[in-house]
């Protein structure tokens, strides 16, 4: 990924002193700068556009001519905010389906890897990104760990930020999830923001359901985007106050159908709105990426030109990279989607830097250190139980998951302890046991609690993906099955596991930082299909169970969470006991 071609070389190519490598001729160019569609040929040299329109003077004897007569030429699409680690494959393997579906640029916040491997992990991502045809811009992770109420494998401080933002691929400071730290003026968080703004980088936000005064303070700190709005009125108010609105349409959290029709109906300007995924599961990624969002936006009533703009130039302008990507314009990268049908957004072929994307083959080699990150002692059923007074009713706090959202609700439920004082799950009412096991070899913490909405009828599920500190999260009906699940993940050095009736029925190894596979997305998706089938057979009907499950431990999104340190009330921003009351 080369973001810069020598100016002299560009000028020579544009003026015909050297001839173009490739010319696309006969196509209808989609111009997101003027919202026009015009018949224009495009000349490309060393991956950059050096001529548009009559480019006959740039044609040489060795220039490749690509006939796109009758087709539309669209700028490569851009995902304005994604944690690529949610695909469960490495960045190189992620690039393959992304490019195939017309996404040629992404802004990645690699805070999953950062929480495990720290600054070195981000440097590794930047190094890998530089080898790819995918334009992988980086927003440096700002909240590692997300709070002090969990144990991460590493941390990112101001000195790390200073070092990392010197890289030319860095375009901003990643989402500032610690909004209390901002509004109460934590000096570390403010120093991070100052450092980014001083270098003219953007600072992305993460601020669901703030009070009006909190939002004022948060925005005045210099934070300019949000993708976490829960209700339309909240999103609209942020736009009115001058924030850029990211409409998120990922695998677990979806807002496109909720927000876009109302924005269109209210006649709101969309120039400060762009599309993001945040998280994309491999099964969804293989079916489509940003092209799926463009297609759906058109179905919801947006014009193709506006839908494409919200997936290209709008995001590029926000991140101040529109001089490189985001449009088919002079001097920009020749990232071109050839469309068979504009209205249905059917892709014929994709070119990154003027080359067909199918020519890319992942080849990056990773250091051994990334494959040894799951470090906890084997656990027993007893380690995962909550004990109290024997043979009594207890009012307990329960994490209630919400389908299609990553917010949770804070509920209470009455559970009865057995004669040994063990609080047992209530399977009939879908109140199950959940545990978070510290896996970075730091302290051996185990947080325990109760969860509703997973739907398991027997067995357990577990994974070493647990946003954001990525400790092992295990939910189950039976504590012995939960222990088996956790210990299987330990033996795999990271992954996902489903246990039923005392046996491991499916598992997926994720040895890279306990988060990713080095296999192609197709192979990971096949294994995930088996995992989804297995978890459905033990009762879970959630549309994206492992993504939903992975957010149980994230203590910056309302309302109730579980970390390795214990149950966390996000609204109170404090740890609370899983037992609310022992009832007489």
Swiss-Prot record:
Enzyme class, broadest EC rank: hydrolase
Organism: Methanococcoides burtonii (strain DSM 6242 / NBRC 107633 / OCM 468 / ACE-M)
Similarity remark: Belongs to the metallo-dependent hydrolases superfamily. Adenine deaminase family.
Keywords: Hydrolase, Manganese
Stretches of the chain forming a coiled coil according to its record: none
Cofactor(s), by name: Mn(2+)
Reactions it catalyzes: adenine + H2O + H(+) = hypoxanthine + NH4(+)
EC number(s) from the headed UniProt entry: 3.5.4.2
S-S bonds: none
Protein name: Adenine deaminase
Biological processes annotated in GO: adenine catabolic process
Superkingdom as given in the UniProt entry: Archaea
Keyword Manganese: yes
Molecular function, one GO term: adenine deaminase activity
């Amino acid at each position: 990924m080369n973001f810069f071609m020598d100016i002299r070389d560009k000028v020579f190519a544009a003026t015909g002193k050297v001839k173009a490598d490739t010319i696309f001729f006969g196509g209808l160019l989609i111009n997101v700068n003027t919202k026009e569609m015009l018949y224009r040929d495009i000349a490309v040299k060393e991956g950059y556009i050096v001529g548009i329109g009559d480019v006959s003077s740039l044609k040489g004897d060795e220039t490749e001519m690509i006939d796109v007569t009758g087709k539309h030429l669209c700028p490569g699409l851009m995902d304005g905010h994604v944690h690529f680690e949610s695909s469960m494959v490495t960045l190189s393997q992620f690039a393959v389906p992304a490019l195939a579906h017309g996404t040629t640029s992404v802004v990645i916040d690699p805070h999953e890897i950062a929480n495990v491997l720290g600054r070195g992990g981000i440097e590794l991502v930047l190094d890998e990104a530089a080898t790819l045809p995918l334009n992988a811009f980086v927003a440096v992770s700002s909240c590692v760990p997300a709070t002090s109420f969990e144990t991460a494998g590493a941390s990112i401080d101001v000195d790390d930020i200073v070092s990392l933002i010197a890289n030319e691929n860095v375009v901003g400071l990643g989402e500032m999830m610690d909004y209390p730290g901002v509004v109460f003026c934590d000096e570390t968080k403010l120093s991070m923001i100052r450092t980014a703004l001083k270098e003219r980088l953007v600072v992305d936000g993460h601020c669901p359901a703030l009070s009006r005064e909190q939002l004022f303070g948060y925005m005045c700190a210099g934070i300019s985007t949000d993708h976490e709005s829960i209700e339309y009125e909240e999103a609209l108010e942020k736009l009115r106050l001058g924030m850029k609105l990211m409409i998120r349409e990922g695998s677990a959290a979806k807002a496109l159908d909720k927000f876009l029709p109302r924005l269109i109906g209210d006649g709101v300007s969309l120039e400060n709105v762009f599309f993001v995924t945040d998280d994309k599961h491999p099964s969804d990624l293989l079916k489509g990426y940003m092209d799926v969002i463009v297609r759906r936006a058109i179905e919801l009533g947006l014009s193709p030109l506006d839908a494409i703009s919200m997936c290209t130039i709008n995001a590029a302008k926000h991140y101040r990279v529109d001089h490189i990507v985001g449009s088919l314009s002079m001097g920009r990268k020749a990232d071109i989607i050839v469309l068979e049908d504009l209205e249905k957004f059917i892709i014929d072929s994709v070119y990154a830097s003027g080359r067909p994307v199918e020519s890319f083959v992942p080849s990056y080699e990773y250091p051994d250190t990334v494959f040894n990150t799951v470090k906890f002692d084997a656990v027993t059923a007893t380690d995962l139980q909550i004990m109290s007074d024997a043979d009594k009713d207890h009012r307990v706090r329960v994490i209630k998951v919400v389908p299609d959202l990553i917010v949770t609700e804070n509920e209470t439920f009455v559970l009865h302890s057995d004669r040994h004082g063990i609080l047992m799950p209530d399977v009939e009412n879908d109140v199950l046991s959940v545990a978070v096991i510290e896996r970075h070899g730091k302290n051996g913490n185990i947080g325990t609690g109760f969860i509703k909405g997973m739907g398991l009828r027997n067995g357990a599920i577990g994974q070493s993906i647990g946003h954001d500190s990525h400790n092992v999260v295990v939910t189950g009906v039976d504590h012995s099955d939960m222990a088996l699940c956790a210990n299987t993940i330990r033996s795999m050095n990271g992954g996902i596991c489903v246990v039923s009736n005392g046996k491991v029925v499916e598992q997926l190894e994720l040895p890279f930082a306990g988060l990713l596979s080095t296999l192609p997305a197709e192979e990971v998706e096949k294994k995930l299909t088996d995992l989804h089938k297995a978890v459905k057979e033990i009762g879970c009907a959630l549309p994206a169970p492992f993504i939903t499950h992975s957010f149980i431990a994230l203590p910056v999104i309302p309302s109730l969470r579980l970390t390795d340190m214990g149950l966390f009330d996000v609204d109170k921003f404090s740890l609370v006991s899983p037992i609310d009351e022992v009832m007489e």
